[in-house]
Curated annotation (Swiss-Prot):
The lineage of its organism: Eukaryota, Metazoa, Chordata, Craniata, Vertebrata. PANTHER family: CHROMOSOME 2 OPEN READING FRAME 81, SI:DKEY-97L20.6. Pfam families: DUF4639. Residues 1-23, 203-215, 347-356 have a biased composition (Basic and acidic residues). This is Uncharacterized protein C2orf81 homolog. It comes from Bos taurus. The keyword Kinase does not apply. The modification Phosphoserine is found at S239, S243. Keywords: Phosphoprotein.
Length: 503
């Protein structure tokens, strides 16, 4: 037994050493730093557990304090219930008693010293909105309609006028003109090529057909009869000064009054030019007018002196053509008019007529009626406002108009503006002419100066402080007893006659 004891101890030691040799080495757990070098993960977990413990303790303490305060408040309400009820009943009884009696309102004390009580400043004048409806009159341009033009509303009692205002002689030749005869004779009715029409007719054309039967004195001077032939004959009697100008001038101004006779469309200058002058006594002009249903815008006329046909153009005078174009011209004319007839029907209301801008001044036609004075100016302004006429250019004499190039009238006339409102705007009173009342000021936008009355205000003398508000009623200067006892007195004021009034 003694020998076994030390042997077992020796075996156990050997077994333990073998077991230690076989056990693998322990790997150290890596530490994660929350704050590098200062706070590790283990320390962070310890702090979190400690904080959670403190939160739990804080919640428990808050619950205990809330219970204690709630119990104390209930005890306070129980003690104050009776005194509060008594005070509320007393105030209610006093209010009911005041309702029984009318108490005098003494108002607020020290109103003048109170800065919140003061006069309001003068409100600024409202500015006019330029975009408001009716503030600014808007002008719209009327669209042009080819050769159509506004009828010039002249007096029906005036002398018949002739739509002739161009030159009958060649502008390039300097030698005197030979005697020749011009005759336009539409004996037969218009051919279908001239009156060819496709599609429905417009209301303006129907109105022109209705007014065609009433049109008289188209190319007549001092006569009103009608026949079926139109002939113009001019025989110069050797006078080198005879120069009659014919021109059919048209402008693209839109036609407004369709039923007006054509005899009132032409200006006084054309009639003055076509009337025989004293220095050209040998010249005579015979114009006989008969019923002409339609007149084309271009007419071919035989001219024996020029050796070829002559073209009547609405915007130019007589232009002699060479003989080699005499045969080609009629076919080209008919084909052109045929193409034009397919789109629009010829109408007397659309015939070219002189422009209002070529009307002469009163000194060129002393026998005609011309507006003069304030009434004439008012009538002219009324026509201009209605948009029916245009202002004639000033400073153009008859010689200046004759020297102008006739081809310039081919250019379109500037469009006429029509006003959308008939409201007349009066000019604003000048700030310098106004007499302001004491205490009233006005801002002058042109000079950027605040205008005020010449009389100084009393408030400025006393100071910038606002005047005190009277709390009591003002004392009357006259009592009712004085009014009842005093006799009635009347004073007659001298009558002042107005400077413009008649006696």
């Amino acid at each position: 037994m003694a020998h076994e004891g030390p042997r077992q101890v020796r075996d156990r030691g050997m077994t333990r050493s073998k077991a230690e040799k076989v056990r693998p080495p322990t790997v150290p757990v890596p530490q994660v730093d929350i704050v590098p070098g200062r706070l590790t993960e283990a320390e962070w977990i310890a702090f979190t557990a400690l904080e959670e413990g403190e939160d739990v303790v804080g919640d428990i303490l808050a619950d205990l304090v809330a219970r204690v305060i709630d119990s104390a408040f209930k005890v306070y309400l129980t003690q104050q219930c009776i005194p509060f009820t008594i005070s509320q009943a007393r105030e209610a009884m006093l209010q009911i008693t005041e309702w029984r009696f009318l108490a005098r309102d003494e108002g607020e004390s020290a109103v003048a010293e109170d800065p919140t009580w003061g006069e309001d400043e003068e409100p600024l004048a409202c500015t006019t909105d330029a975009w408001a409806q009716g503030s600014v009159p808007v002008l719209h341009a009327r669209a042009s309609m080819g050769l159509e033009e506004t009828f010039q509303g002249e007096d029906q009692d005036s002398v018949d006028q002739i739509p002739l205002g161009g030159s009958w002689k060649d502008s390039g030749s300097q030698e005197p003109m030979e005697s020749w005869e011009l005759t336009v004779t539409p004996d037969s009715p218009p051919t279908p090529e001239l009156l060819q029409e496709t599609g429905p007719r417009s209301p303006l054309e129907k109105l022109g057909d209705q007014s065609r039967s009433d049109q008289t004195d188209l190319f007549a001077v001092g006569s009103s009869n009608s026949s079926s032939q139109l002939s113009m004959e001019m025989v110069p009697a050797g006078s080198t000064h005879a120069s009659l100008e014919l021109s059919l001038v048209a402008s693209p101004q839109a036609s407004v009054e369709r039923a007006q006779p054509i005899s009132s469309q032409f200006s006084l200058e054309d009639l003055y030019n076509c009337t025989p002058q004293p220095h050209a006594a040998g010249d005579r002009l015979e114009l006989r007018e008969e019923k002409v249903p339609l007149i084309p815008s271009r007419v071919l006329v035989s001219d024996p002196s020029a050796g070829g046909p002559t073209t009547l153009n609405p915007s130019a005078g007589f232009q002699p053509q060479p003989p080699w174009l005499a045969e080609e011209r009629p076919s080209a004319l008919h084909s052109r008019i045929g193409r034009m007839g397919t789109t629009a029907r010829l109408d007397p209301a659309r015939l070219p007529r002189p422009d209002m801008a070529r009307s002469p001044s009163p000194k060129l036609w002393p026998g005609a009626k011309w507006p003069s004075g304030w009434e004439g100016e008012a009538e002219l302004l009324g026509e201009l406002w209605a948009g029916r006429t245009r202002v004639p250019p000033q400073g153009l004499d008859l010689g200046d108009r004759e020297s102008q190039d006739p081809h310039q009238y081919r250019h379109p006339v500037p469009q006429v503006l029509e006003a959308t409102s008939q409201v007349t705007w009066k000019p604003v009173l000048l700030p310098g002419a106004l007499k302001l009342a004491p205490g009233v000021s006005m801002w002058n936008p042109s000079t950027q100066v605040l205008l005020s009355s010449s009389e100084p205000q009393r408030n400025d003398r006393e100071g910038s402080a606002s005047p005190p508000i009277h709390t009591g009623a003002p004392k009357p200067q006259v009592t009712v007893a004085q009014l009842m006892n005093s006799a009635l007195k009347m004073w007659s004021l001298p009558s002042k006659r107005l400077p413009n009034s008649k006696p």
